[in-house]
Amino acid sequence: MRNSAVFNRYSIISGALFFITLLTAHSVSSAENVNRYRSHYKAALLADAESGRILHHDRMHQKIYPASLVKMMVALIALEELESGRISLQDSVKVSRWASKIGGHQVYLKQGEIFKFRELMEATVIASANDASVAVAEHVLGSDKVFIKRMNERALELGMNKTRFYSVHGLPPGRGQQLDVSSAYDLYLLALELIKHPQFLRWSSTRLESFRNGTFQLLNTNHRLIKSYRGMEGMKTGYHRRAGFNLVSSAKRDGQRYISIIIGAKNSRMRSKTTRHLLDYGFNNYQKFELNKIDADVSYSAGVKGGELENVPLRATEAVNLLLSAEEHRRLEIWPQIPVQTGAPVKAEQKLGTLEFWLDGKLLKEVALQTEFAVLEQSVLSELTSMLTNLSGTN
């Protein structure tokens, strides 16, 4: 609630409250420019990677076929197992007969060959190798069937409610098998989790890597954008005939990172073009507004009953950085939720109320307010002195 009997309610435009460092906003790429290509893809999404705020979306909950984007989940589970210490990048992995038989995009693993686990992860993430992805799954959990079960469990943990994995590679299914299914929104949730692992971004942004002691080169399936789009960190491509051309990507400039998702593009060129437009829309129209503590000209305080002071000043417990367009910044409202009065004694840095940041009726952020110093309970002598002062003031 934004109002109650014990809280003061204010609607204050943020520019009057905070010192803001603002660069000129450009509108080179508008939402309309992004939407003009919507007939060329099945779903799209753009999000701020830090806050998770979705800035643009189109059919984001529609069922789609991820194709090789399933390898994002393979990578996530493998990285989580690596970080737990249960496996190591230096582990030796013997290629199974099953892994060697997987077709499609591959690095031509042969049964009985031995690779470092790191090499197989690189082949999976950089080159989207289906055979390497199976070998990774088998090493991590013993078999791809057990691994697929874990993929679906992890998807549910992340809230990927429209996702169902049936493979570790994303290839079109054989007779009697089912297609992997997901949604742009679910893949956004997966991408948010993946970027918490710097090693994944190091691999996915690698354009070219040697394999088999330099006799084979792993070319990133997103190599064109990695080379030509400033800040592109890669992530993962996917394609088969029914899926269309898919790309989940992340790009970072000047500390600002966006996640872009294009699903079902008609060809790789259109996939790259719409990805550029999405990312341009983010970089050109949004920026981080630094709402740095509370401005010196504006102060909040709470009344203190029975204290040596009648009021105690309050400060925000943290700086607030919000990604906004210039127009959104003008509409931003800040609502202090402060108790009318609190009883003494009051501790230093005691939490008393909150600041709420609202945009178009939606709560974007809430931070606690705390006292700047302690207020002791009023002593008998102080209370008597105060009473005498008040009495003398009435004569």
Give residue spans per PLM region.
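Bacterial N-terminal signal peptides that target proteins for export
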Residues: R2-G15
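Bacterial N-terminal signal peptides
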Residues: S14-T24
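Generic marker of residues within folded, mature protein domains
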Residues: I20-T21, V34, E83-G85, R241, ...
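Bacterial Sec-dependent signal peptides at the C-terminal "C-region" and cleavage site
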Residues: A25-N33, Q370
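Generic structural signal for hydrophobic residues
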Residues: S29, R150-M151, T221, L278
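Active-site-adjacent loops and short helices of periplasmic peptidoglycan-processing enzymes
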Residues: S30-L189, L194-P198
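Domain-terminus/edge residues, biased toward the C-terminal soluble/receptor-binding domains
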Residues: M160, R175-N395
